[in-house]
């Protein structure tokens, strides 16, 4: 035995264990690029489902986009939705099996462009589902085109001179809009740029799943995320770019924390 | 009862678990009837008005993943919007029943009856190589019966089934014999029927289930396609349904489905009084198409007349079945106009007998 092997054996003793991969994450190598936030958020979801003991009740709805393959990594039942339709698919699942736990996992193109209608109406109905929204201001899977959340001046494959307001309009702060809807119970914006942020994001995701159990309405967690490949930056630069450019436009924190509105506020008088 | 109302009544009585829809003329009575009946109070059936036909069909997709019996209904422009979800359901092999009470097109077209969605329904309607079982009711009774049959076929083949009605049948009032109320499937029954694929939460003793139409490996994707094609071949072998009326001694045969077939039945009587030996083949399944019976008669008769409320769509399938052995002509009206039996009889003489 080499000295190195002896040392490794010493280190991997169970009593030295401080962190382990969630049992709900399998051993498949993720297809995500280095520095991408998806892997971290997948891990947080897997941990929350495991810690809450709801693996056998949970159905995930994966989107079209980089996270289309989320179903390859987390060991729960999944339904893969058409582009943008995850909130409608989740509505269908939850309505026929209200005792189950249902969540969507969507990117910015999926949730805030092609699926805007499905997103708004699911939240407005106050569907008892969790929606996880990965906002990295770009289309990753199709090769880095403009997203609804792309910042003004940001260079993408379809805005080679930077996003131009006259041509492309404004970055869509859909989370702020959703927080206005009476069906929303919990709306928050998080990120995963450092360990402290990861811990906060996990707390938010857990809270979202707890709100579903309490049938309080839709729980919506945006995670401001990196896309190193799309942004053409290395992982460290990506985090820095996100903090400097994304956070001012997409400030972190809770936008709504209550439960869906009382119907009386909206009812006819007679 | 009215054709559209019967769809709702049959759905409740056969133990359907959920209906998702969006209002559109001429079939809005389906959801209105469901909402008035409040089946969620009796059986727990879910009825939800969605924000669009797109959302409706994807709610159906989601709910069907549970292994439960789920349906929607719409009319032509709405079905176009659903094409995406129908393709996904065919690809993911999910069962459901979709009712199309057709109106005239293209575009917004008209709210009057039409059969112009024949090609859309029988050739899949969305992207990719897929087919639906397509049932064409010609009476209010069949509107009822095909909801029940539709769910049977949907689960036998794990496929979306389309009931291709038209505005006439949807709005028609006729007597109908309703089935007795059947209970919705229990969770145990659902587990037995769909437990090998449904996404109801991963039990400890099984692998996770994933419902998807996606496959990045071309060889596996081709195998998936071949499996679908095998299914369609089996439908062609086992599910063809048609009605042959006065065809035994016929020199000419009309082919018509749905409300067009009702008109042609009268045309048969009118023509026979004139001494013209004409029969009628009414395809009940438009997919699988009754090509064998048409091919058999192709060597016996002097010609076929396809009668359709469109520009001539089914006529192509008849020509394929006839394969050049005899004459095949088309007569139809468009834009919501329903021809009279005399008009069809005149076309029979003009286009087929003297033409």
Predicted features, each with a name:
Chain A
Residues 1-140, 203-207:
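Thiamine diphosphate
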Residues 1-18, 27, 213-270:
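Flexible, low-complexity linker and terminal segments
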Residues 20, 147-214:
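Conserved thiamine diphosphate
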Residues 57-60, 100-103, 128-132, 176, ...:
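Structural motif
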Residues 64-66, 136-138, 194, 223-230:
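Glycine-rich beta-alpha junction loops
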Residues 76-79, 122, 147-151, 237-240:
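Short, hinge-like loop/turn segments at secondary-structure boundaries
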Residues 116-121, 141-155:
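Active-site-proximal loop->helix
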